[in-house]
Amino acid sequence: MAENILEKIIKKKVEKIENLKKTTKLDTLNELINKNKSFIDFKDKIQKNINNRKLSIIAEIKKASPSAGIIIKDYNPVEIANTYNQNKVTCLSVLTEEDFFLGNLIHISKIKEKIKLPILCKDFFVDKFQVPLAKSHGADAILIIMAGVSETLANELYEEAIKLNMTVIVEVHTIEEAKQALKFKSALIVINNRNLKTLKTDINTTFDIHDVLKNHTGPLISESGIKTKEELLELSNKTSIKTFLIGESLLKNLDKNSIFSVL
C-alpha cells in the first residue's frame, strides 16, 4: 500500500531528527533557552480573549504546503508577521518543516527578534528532543498531531512541553482522536478540517467533532478551510469555539483581508 502524505512527512522527519541529535547536545539547547527572554504565554493570551468575549486568530506563516504548492514566492516571514501584528492577530503559527512546507526553525528566531507575539512551532513532532529544540529558537507552543503519533509519544511530548512551560496544542481530525485528546487537560485542542492523509478539507469536520470536545477545560480551535469572515463567524456562532488558526486565506490576501475585522 502506498504511503500517504502524512506518513512520508513523518518518515523524513524521523531521519532528520535522528541526524540532528548526533550533532546537537541537549545542554546546548538548555543554555539557549535560559538566555532567551522572548517567551510569551500562548495559552494565556487566548484565554484572556475568551474571558473578554473576544475572538482570537492564530495567523499562520508558511511558504508552501503539499496541498497548495508554493503560496508565497518571495517569502519574508518577518514581513508577514509584521503585517499580522499590525492587524492585531492574537498569536502566530510558523511552519518550520523543511522538506514539504519549506520552513525553518530560524524563522521563529527572526520573528521573535522583531515582534512580541506568542508563536506556535507548527511542525511534525516525532521525538521529545524537538520540544527543547523548538523552545531554544523562541517558540512558545508546540503541536501534537494525534494522527501522526503513538499514545506513548503523545504523552512524552506533552510532559516535556509542560516541564518547559510551553503551551501544548493537540490536533485532531476524527472523533476517536478527539476522545484521546481530552486527557491532555491543560492543552488547547485544535480541530483540523483537513484530512492530513488525503489533504481534503471539509469545514463540517469542526461541527462533527465539537460535541465530543465541548467540555474540555482548555480553549478549542478550528483550522483549515476557513476562507471568509462569514465562515469564521458561522463556526463561532454555532459552536463554543472562539479561536481560529488561519493560513492560506490570509496569506493570499494580506493587505485588505476582511477576516481581520472580526478582531
Residue ranges and their predicted role:
Residues M1-K62, S67:
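N-terminal amphipathic alpha-helix/helix-capping segment at the start of soluble metabolic enzymes
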Residues I57-I61, L92-V94, I119-K122, I142-I144, ...:
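Hydrophobic faces of well-ordered beta-strands that scaffold small-molecule active sites
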Residues K13, I203-L213, L250-L263:
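C-terminal helical cap(s) of enzyme catalytic domains, especially alpha/beta-barrels
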Residues I9, A59, Y84, L92, ...:
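Conserved, mostly hydrophobic/aromatic
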Residues K12, E60-A64, E97, F124, ...:
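Active-site beta-loop-alpha junctions enriched in small/polar residues
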Residues L133-L153, V190-L199, T239-F260:
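Glycine-rich phosphate-binding active-site loops on the catalytic face of alpha/beta enzymes
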Residues S67-I169, E177-Q180, T206-I209:
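N-terminal active-site wall of soluble small-molecule enzyme domains
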Residues V126-G138, H173-K185, H216-I246, S258-V262:
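Catalytic cores of alpha/beta
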